[in-house]
A protein has these predicted regions:
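GT-A fold catalytic core of metal-dependent nucleotide-sugar glycosyltransferases
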Residues: 1-42
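Short, surface-exposed linear patches
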Residues: 4, 30-39, 54-55, 99, ...
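Low-complexity, flexible helical/coil segments
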Residues: 10, 14, 45-51, 71-75, ...
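A short secondary-structure junction signal
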Residues: 19-23, 43-45, 92-98
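Short beta-strand-to-loop element that shapes/binds the nucleotide-sugar donor at the catalytic cleft/hinge
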Residues: 27-63
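Catalytic core and acceptor-binding pocket of nucleotide-sugar-dependent glycosyltransferases
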Residues: 61-169
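Long, low-complexity C-terminal extensions of enzymes
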Residues: 151, 163-188
């Protein structure tokens, strides 16, 4: 039934649409959204899966791609909360990512950020045709003093990510490093 549609998009359940969304989401292939926490960050600081045994593992990120005729340096770290694209391309991605996740599960492993990690791995090998700004996964807990220096501008919210209880506490640098799989900050 899904194959009858020109485009398919996925959106997390904890999102609120707050602004008009037009044809800027449509491209010739996949559409991915820059993760607001990692927009304009260096690859070292992006939470790619560090386990070489995982299907989501990304060893040496860094590739120049073209999206909508504009050069982009990959990696960008993409949010899993809003994604999609041309039906054929997106269903193919979903099928492959499902197999990647199943393979990891057969080894009793869950990628660092679950399906989002696999989405990022897939996009490293199959770059998106359309890259959306963090406006499409805009945190409701936005702290302008934090995001403005990262983004260099203010993206107007289109889809707002609702804060989950476990994300309301800001983690210390050591806690963040531990979550990224680095128990010792001196290794940075």
């Amino acid at each position: 039934k899904l194959k009858e549609y020109d485009y398919i998009f996925y959106c997390d359940v904890d999102m609120r649409f707050v602004n008009y969304i037009g044809d800027e989401i449509f491209g010739d292939g996949l559409t991915a959204t820059q993760h607001p926490m990692y927009a304009f960050k260096r690859p070292l600081w992006m939470p790619f899966d560090p386990n070489p045994e995982s299907e989501a593992y990304i060893k040496q990120p860094g590739t120049l791609i073209e999206s909508e005729g504009k050069p982009l340096f990959m990696p960008l770290y993409f949010a899993g909360g809003f994604q999609g694209g041309k039906t054929e391309k997106y269903l193919e991605a979903a099928k492959i990512i499902s197999k990647m996740i199943d393979k990891d599960l057969s080894k009793n492993y869950i990628a660092r950020w679950n399906d989002e990690s696999h989405w990022n791995k897939y996009l490293m090998d199959n770059p998106p045709a359309r890259v959306l700004t963090p406006s499409f996964v805009y945190p409701d807990s936005l702290i302008e003093e934090y995001y403005k220096p990262i983004w260099g501008c203010n993206y107007p919210p289109k889809i707002v990510t609702l804060t989950k209880k476990f994300t309301t506490r800001i983690l210390s640098a050591q806690e963040q490093a531990t979550l990224r799989g680095m128990s010792d900050l001196t290794k940075l």
